[in-house]
Amino acid sequence: MRFYLDENVPIDVLRIGRSLGLDIVSSHEVDNDALTDPQQLDYAAAHGRCLITINRDDFIRLTNEFASTDRPHAGVLIIPQGLSQHAARRVVDAILQYVERRGSMPADYLCDFLRA
């Protein structure tokens, strides 16, 4: 499974995730920090990446909008807001457990929550 971190996810999640073998790209790396939420999800969808965010309300709504307009995406994982930088390892562990449960294939329109 391939992941895309939006601009609100701590960059340590990227660093730790990669060190543990996850295929992760951040919005910072591809110069997408200024994109709107729909554009972030469009980017992730176009690249077959499951988007990871802390922006629960907007991305739940966007997932429904994409589904109702037949615009597939590779899923959205929502992590808790207000995590400290020290929580990045717990977030990555939750992502690894998620991949173990779900397998390596993304699920169109999936919106799920990770506990870290």
Where are these regions (language model features)?
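Short, basic, glycine/proline-bearing loop/turn elements
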Residues: 20-29
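Short beta->alpha connector loops at strand-helix junctions that form conserved
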Residues: 28, 55, 80
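Acidic, PIN/NYN-like endoribonuclease modules and their adjacent C-terminal/linker elements
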Residues: 1-7, 11, 16-19, 32, ...
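Short, surface-exposed loop/turn motifs that are enriched in glycine and acidic residues
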Residues: 29-30, 49
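Acidic, metal-binding active-site segment of PIN/NYN-like and related structure-specific nucleases
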Residues: 37, 43-62
